[in-house]
Amino acid sequence: MYGKMKEHLSKTLAEIKEAGLYKEERLIESAQQAAITVKGKEVLNFCANNYLGLSNHPRLIAAAQKIMERRGYGMSSVRFICGTQDIHKELEAAISDYFKTEDTILYAACFDANGGVFEPLFTEEDAIISDSLNHASIIDGVRLCKAKRYRYANADMTELEKCLQEAQAQRFRIIVTDGVFSMDGNVAPMDKICDLAEKYDALVMVDESHSAGVVGATGHGVSELYDTYGRVDIYTGTLGKAFGGALGGFTTGRKEIIDLLRQRSRPYLFSNSLAPGIIGASLEVFKMLKESNSLHDKLVENVNYFRDKMTAAGFDIKPTQSAICAVMLYDAKLSQIYAARMQEEGIYVTGFYYPVVPKDQARIRVQISAGHNKEHLDKCIAAFIKVGKELGTKVSHPNK
């Protein structure tokens, strides 16, 4: 039987390669940080989710080592059998405090948090209204649920209102959105979303994976940015981006929602508990963020500097308040060539093109970190300018 399947798989893989969509894993020979080692050469990393520069922070490493000496390496159990230590509850409390919510539940990843949130809470009597650019984990989570599904164009409040009107016959309605959308870096208009939710009696859920630690006056996410505390019912997020970059996800929000997820959310019930080392380091992250806003301030300074310099150089960058800067090139082939040349110049970036982004919307996504210094940013900007001149690139939109 496998001979027949192998033929099918080989054909599928060949088609993926022919379409230019085959993903290669690029090996890093150093710790994850602003300057990394690839093939024995130091390059500057501008494609990591390491927004606060904490992935290799000495305080996190020391905290992980210390907690492993006290609590061991792994848990070898799910949470409800013998996989919950006191430190797991401490981290859940720290996350609740950070987001100003009532309770929190930890998962192995945010993919699991989003995959396990809908099915326990909603049935065919209910409606889930989702932004068209929401993360794949939200899409998959919704698919596991029998609720009626609606989708509105990215951040389009007119379409969202129409969906809410159509869903009025359903028992419960929930609006689901990313806080920051990963390809454009744009921020969901949470104030307007909450206004519509209140007008049409709907719940609100936001995935803070790319926004927590990044947006808002002190980096506390979209509810801080738009002052929607108390108006959002469910937050999901990750420990794998701004909060240290290791592993782990969470859902935080109303107490009764979290209580039911502990009873019925399958990724929580049937997955191993997060390892003590990750818990210890994550607790140190939230301690650091409570002590000072310096990392967030540095991130904002870096983002503004990069955007201003790139715009002055003539590049077309999507407007955003996040740490994701989409440098628009529009042409798919050009984005691939450009990214490859940038890597030759010692700048690690990635080109994105259809079908990951819409046709004729190819771009290079640059992710800024508090771990970058001015010299790193200047080198990246200089490389963009140099490669652009080499390729004869018109960096503004062809229709402008």
Could you tell me what each predicted segment is?
Residues 150, 154-206:
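Active-site phosphate-binding strand-loop segment of PLP-dependent enzymes
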Residues 58, 62-66, 70, 93, ...:
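PLP-dependent enzyme catalytic core of the Aspartate aminotransferase-like
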Residues 78-84, 92-116:
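Short loop-beta-helix segment that forms the pyridoxal 5′-phosphate
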Residues 6-73, 202:
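N-terminal "arm"/small-domain region of PLP-dependent enzymes with the aminotransferase-like
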Residues 218, 224-260:
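Active-site PLP attachment segment
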Residues 243-310, 315-318:
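PLP-dependent aminotransferase class I/II
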Residues 297-306, 311-346, 356, 360-361, ...:
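Conserved PLP-binding catalytic core of the aspartate aminotransferase-like
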Residues 117-136:
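Conserved PLP-anchoring active-site segment centered on the Schiff-base-forming lysine
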